[in-house]
Amino acid sequence: MLKHLIETFGCNQPFAISEITYKDYSQIWIYKSVAELCKKGEIVHLDRGVYYIPKKNKYGIVPFDPMKIIEKKYIKDNENVQGFYSGKYLLYQLGISKVQPKTIEIYSNNETQRSKVVNICGKRLLLHKPRTKIDKFNASVLCFLELMNGIDVETLDEYKRKLITDYIAENRITQRQITKYIPYFPDKTCRNLIESEVIYRVPQ
């Protein structure tokens, strides 16, 4: 069973127990096997229904990166895009802010409440229900519009505008996409797009 899990998911990669299939064995047998492997320390229970197989080297156990479970649970599970980072954490990711926030803000299809704080593996998350369903085709433009909705226009200099322009180019965001999704956002978003002059950097 352990060999099968390693071959299927690899080490230090989170996986859901619901993803496990093994020969013709029942889910009850799989649950019992996973519980037994947990007792032996062969796999680690991370969160509800989520586990990982510890990676070992000559120095011992390689630390697990908690961002992997956050990515899998709220951002992207294999090819299924279901969320994006936002707020101060996104500003930090883009280099617009140099201060790493203690809270990671995320919009995700897996959150049904307007706003909720949770802790996962020592990471504090502020989760939001998205304005519309997120998928691989609209995640980038929705992320961009959330960025512009929350941005302080007066703090934007040319360097920061360039960082936003780079994000637009890298994600191939177009004015056509913005026109499609801007109705989901408050008037402030459109106002910030114009006042910051960022809208003029978005291709047709």
Where are these regions (language model features)?
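Short beta-edge/loop segments at beta->alpha junctions of small alpha/beta modules
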Residues: 1-75
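Short acidic-hydrophobic surface loop/beta-edge motif
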Residues: 114-120
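A short, charged helix-loop
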Residues: 121-129
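Short, surface-exposed loop/turn motifs that are enriched in glycine and acidic residues
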Residues: 60, 76-80, 134
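Amphipathic alpha-helical interface surfaces
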Residues: 30, 86-87, 140
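Short gly/ser-rich loop at a beta-strand->alpha-helix junction or flexible surface loop bordering the NTP-binding
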Residues: 46-50, 78-114
